[in-house]
Design a protein with these regions (language model features):
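Intrinsic disorder at enzyme termini
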Residues: 1-11
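N-terminal capping segment at the start of a domain
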Residues: 17-29
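Internal helix-loop-helix
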Residues: 17, 47-107, 111-116
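Short secondary-structure junction/hinge motifs that connect adjacent elements
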Residues: 27-48
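Glycine-rich, Trp-frequent "lid" loop and neighboring beta-strands that shape
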Residues: 61-62, 104-152
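Short, contiguous strand/loop micro-motifs
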Residues: 3-4, 27-29, 96
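A generic secondary-structure micro-motif detector
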Residues: 6, 30-32, 62
Length: 152
């Protein structure tokens, strides 16, 4: 189980809170109403290490425990939930690579994910389901030892 020193965690939360107060909160309406990509905010998220928040330090990430990460997401979401999706979906893919990737894949992708140089994401949709995950019916079935067959 990952751990973090309480003083270090408090300092991290204080940094996030200052960033939210100074940079995020004043701009939420501007970006939301203009339906504009928050490029400057994303760059700041890179600088804060949010794209590597849960990635192991071995690959350049912060290696935060889930509880610390969840608190960060909660704090940011309380002001602007939409921007948490930018790094949350990214970290879902990073987690899959870190847990299930080959050593070569990990060495290649995780350092780039950790810095935000490249970002992962996910897309879930079907013609009759849209993005309603409960309605998705497509499945992948193993086809011998060579791979999978997808029914959609």
């Amino acid at each position: 189980m990952k751990t973090i020193d309480k003083a270090e965690e408090a300092q991290l939360f204080a940094t996030i809170d200052r960033w939210i107060e100074r940079e995020v909160a004043p701009r939420v309406k501007e970006f939301d109403h203009a339906d504009k990509w928050p490029a400057e905010i994303v760059e700041q998220m890179k600088e804060l290490g949010l794209f590597g928040a849960t990635i192991s330090p071995e690959y350049g990430g912060l290696g935060l425990p889930a509880t610390t990460y969840a608190e960060i997401v909660m704090r940011i979401s309380s002001v602007w939930m939409a921007i948490t999706g930018i790094f949350n979906s990214h970290l879902m893919l990073a987690l899959a690579v870190e847990k299930f990737g080959t050593p070569r894949q990990k060495e290649h992708w995780l350092p780039k994910f950790a810095t935000g140089e490249i970002r992962g994401g996910l897309a879930l949709t079907e013609p009759d389901a849209g993005t309603d995950l409960q309605s998705i019916r497509m499945v992948a079935k193993r086809d011998g030892n060579d791979g999978y067959v997808i029914n959609g």
